[in-house]
Amino acid sequence: NVDFKKQAELALAAGAKRAVFYVKTQYLAATLPPGDPGRNNVPDVDKYTEEYILGQIEKAKTQYGDVCQGVFLDEAVNGWGTQAGRIPAYKSLIDKIRARYGKEFLIVINSGSNISEEMCKLDFDVCMMFEKDATAFLNEDQGTPILPDHMKAYPSTRWWAVVHGVTSENYKSVFDKADKLGIAHLYITDGQLREDPQQGGQWAPVGNPYANPPSQHILDLVVPWLKGYLPLKLEVDELRVRPKVLSLGKREAVPAGTPAGTIIVRKDA
């Protein structure tokens, strides 16, 4: 797809650190035996084998060359409960990617939730470990913390949170929470995720927060946060909208060209 290559080139030219290409893994349900509950309701359950996934990465690398600088492995297991049995399959997959493309090839996995201690030991670079709305991010369930202690033991650059439904009222709290937790990668959007169990569920959301980029007022916050000057930006923005104050004598005329909204203070003497 020529457009994929072009968009990746534009992103890199604009300052993006890496361009990674999307490949599904569908929880590696293809590795499960017939009749296993983990295969239930997974579309094309036998399609996404290790061989197929590796083939998709090779196609991306062949077609896009140096622009393909990593892979985004979507729909990865979190390693908890029955999913623990698929950790060896993910280890095999990730180890083969690493052996084929080297340490500079960025491997990103998307579990969408916190991951088990055994999953943390795999050789990925970044894990998208949160993918919910701002309400869930700001009011986390302490029984299932966003970043458990075993994850906090790793560098912040290993963790990536995606927060939907961000508003003008809560975005500061979202950034503050990410800083407090030690999450180095953050994608915020005012887009909403809506799933209808009767119309495809998680596999075909009726409301997709990634269908369009975030609104401009949200986009304008991300780079300042990444570079550490968001508080300064917000202070400057506030000064820009603060009304001007003009001190005049009791009978002094307002100067021509005084901006609308200027506060006029009259001196008694």
Language-model features, listed with the residues they occupy:
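Extracellular/surface-exposed low-complexity repeats and stalk/linker segments enriched in Gly/Pro
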Residues: 236-269
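Glycan-processing catalytic domains of CAZymes
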Residues: 1-233
